[in-house]
């Protein structure tokens, strides 16, 4: 009953693999990977199979693997975070604990069922990457080592999601904490793989020994702790709901404690009201701020704050004080944090009313749809903005303490504007998804998908176009010069220089092909107006490397103020359109009954 006849595993596999979305996910995943490989395929009619000409294939394989690694890392929590928390939401958690199944069998069944989708995706993508091996520059052993590292990482991330799912009552909270833990690890792994691209032996050793060993230890520890938690569950009330008492929780809290009557905690988590609500106040906004947030406890909120600050302190020191010209990367971290936490506090504002069957009652009251809309919006926006602002305080601090930024105060102010617009966008998009969809989980996942597409796709397209569309046509025949000491025929030392072959050979093409590639690059630049990351890295920093204009291969983005202005206009228009649609849907009673 542990594996071969595990009813939990069998039920999850039968239900999940027979859904239409499983086939659609596989089709879309392979179509996207195949399109990337096809677009990045070397355009040369003759390929140099020696070591000097192997750079194109190596870069293509690295791009394929890093992209697949990040995609799998983002999908693993979405499959695993609802395994046990979903049982609590469906009110079957108590029945599962009362079954004769051992806790370890339950955890193993949930873990394997959550990872079966990713296992199929990873296995089916192997033939695509094998197409790149005949190009040279990468061996079969490197590909297999990369897939071993990918498999070990995905299993670890899935186990983290299952562990979070056993701790929290709601899938939304488990998913948020899972992403907050997994995303830094995934970015660290992707950057390490990219930095070691010229150290094949070292990368092969790490991928086959240290990484799988570390992942095995992590999985074993989390598996044991999750099984023990199911063996000795916390206090369970009616219908399998865990009882959360705020006073008891605060007494047992280790580390950060949230007190709603003190500053700054009352900005994002005010205490419950013990007096009458003043006249003219928005009852929806007051209810959302003082009841909804603390109704599920403060554990998720405390973890989010502590993990974000733990990561922000070293990043602040490195990007603001050690390398001041790298400040855009810290701002990107702040925006990425808001991308993770912003939708959480807005994606369930309306779907939770539907799930509790209270939306009809709310719409039959004297509260107008406009009051409901703005109350829901400002409640989620207030919490996410205050949490994000905790990471913004290093910006004015660095502007005052570091002389390097005294001539860049306008750019620093624009950084804050970009962060504020990103906070608004994440809240509005999540609220729109909450109005359109019926279930909170679907609303949250759709909001994440839309926001990541808007924010991440334009920079990814720009990088791809610069390196694989325009780059081959503008690569120089000689990229660096090596010096060597030789002896002439008379025995005298002579310093000679010899050209080093480029990493990627230049492609000889006519001017029409080059012009077409440059036009594609210009279109990719225009897409940057939808992404705060493109706007951040387009802002100039005087006296830094950002002022250096790149050649035709990269078509310098730094100092392009029009990208920042375009982003501000695009964001305001997008949010205005979405809010207008939400207001119209409230007036027509969209999906109120049923």
Model-flagged regions — what are they?
Residues 78, 87, 98, 109, ...:
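Mid-sequence acidic-hydrophobic segments that form the walls
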Residues 26, 42, 50, 66-80, ...:
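N-terminal cofactor/phosphate-binding cores enriched in small/glycine residues
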Residues 1-73, 82, 121, 127-352, ...:
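Transmembrane alpha-helical segments and their membrane-interface loop/helix boundaries
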Residues 9, 83-115, 285, 293, ...:
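Helix-loop-helix units of permease transmembrane domains in multi-pass membrane transporters
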Residues 99-107, 118-126, 167:
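Hydrophobic or amphipathic alpha-helical targeting/insertion segments
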């Amino acid at each position: 009953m542990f594996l071969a006849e595990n009813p939990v595993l069998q039920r999850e596999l039968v239900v999940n693999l027979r859904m239409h979305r499983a086939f659609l996910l596989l089709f879309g995943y392979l179509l996207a990977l195949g399109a990337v490989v096809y677009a990045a395929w070397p355009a040369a009619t003759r390929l140099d199979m020696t070591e000097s000409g192997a750079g194109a294939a190596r870069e293509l394989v690295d791009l394929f693997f890093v992209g697949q690694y990040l995609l799998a890392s983002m999908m693993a929590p979405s499959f695993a975070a609802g395994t046990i928390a979903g049982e609590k939401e469906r009110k079957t958690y108590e029945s599962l604990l009362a079954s004769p199944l051992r806790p370890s069998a339950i955890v193993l069944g949930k873990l394997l069922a959550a990872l079966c989708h990713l296992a199929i995706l990873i296995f089916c993508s192997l033939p695509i990457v094998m197409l790149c091996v005949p190009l040279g520059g990468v061996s079969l052993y490197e590909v297999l080592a990369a897939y071993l590292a990918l498999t070990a990482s995905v299993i670890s991330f899935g186990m983290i999601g299952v562990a979070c799912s056993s701790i929290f009552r709601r899938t939304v909270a488990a998913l948020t904490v899972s992403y907050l833990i997994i995303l830094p690890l995934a970015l660290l792994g992707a950057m390490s793989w990219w930095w070691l691209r010229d150290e094949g032996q070292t990368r092969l050793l790490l991928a086959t020994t240290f990484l799988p060993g570390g992942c095995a230890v992590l999985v074993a520890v989390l598996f044991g702790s999750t099984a023990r938690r199911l063996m000795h569950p916390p206090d369970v009330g009616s219908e399998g709901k865990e009882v959360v008492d705020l006073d008891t929780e605060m007494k047992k809290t280790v580390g950060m404690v949230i007190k709603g009557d003190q500053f700054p905690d009352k900005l994002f988590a005010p205490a419950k009201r013990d007096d009458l609500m003043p006249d003219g106040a928005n009852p929806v906004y007051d209810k959302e701020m003082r009841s909804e947030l603390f109704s599920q406890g403060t554990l998720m909120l405390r973890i989010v704050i502590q993990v974000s600050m733990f990561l922000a302190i070293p990043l602040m020191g490195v990007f603001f004080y050690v390398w001041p010209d790298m400040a855009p990367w810290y701002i990107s971290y702040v925006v990425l944090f808001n991308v993770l936490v912003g939708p959480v506090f807005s994606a369930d504002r309306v779907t939770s009313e539907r799930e509790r069957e209270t939306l009809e009652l709310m719409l039959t009251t004297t509260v107008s749809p406009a009051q409901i809309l703005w109350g829901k919006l400002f409640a989620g926006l207030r919490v996410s903005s205050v949490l994000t602002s905790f990471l913004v305080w290093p910006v004015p601090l660095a502007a005052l303490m570091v002389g390097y930024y005294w001539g860049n105060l306008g750019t620093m102010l624009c950084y804050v504007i970009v962060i504020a617009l990103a906070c608004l966008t994440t809240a509005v998009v999540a609220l729109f998804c909450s109005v359109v969809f019926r279930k909170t989980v679907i609303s949250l996942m759709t909001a994440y998908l839309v926001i990541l597409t808007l924010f991440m796709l334009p920079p990814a397209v720009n990088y791809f176009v610069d390196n694989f569309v325009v780059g081959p046509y503008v690569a120089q025949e000689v990229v660096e010069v090596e010096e060597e000491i030789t002896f002439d025929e008379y025995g005298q030392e002579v310093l000679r220089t010899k050209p080093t072959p480029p990493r990627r050979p230049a492609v000889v093409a006519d001017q029409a092909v080059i012009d077409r590639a440059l036009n594609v690059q210009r279109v990719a630049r225009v897409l940057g107006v939808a992404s705060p990351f493109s706007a951040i890295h387009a802002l100039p920093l005087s006296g830094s490397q950002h002022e250096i204009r790149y050649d035709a291969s990269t078509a310098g983005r730094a100092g392009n103020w029009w990208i920042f202005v375009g982003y501000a206009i695009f964001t305001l228009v997008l949010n205005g359109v979405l809010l207008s649609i939400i207001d119209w849907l409230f007036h027509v009673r969209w999906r109120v009954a049923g």
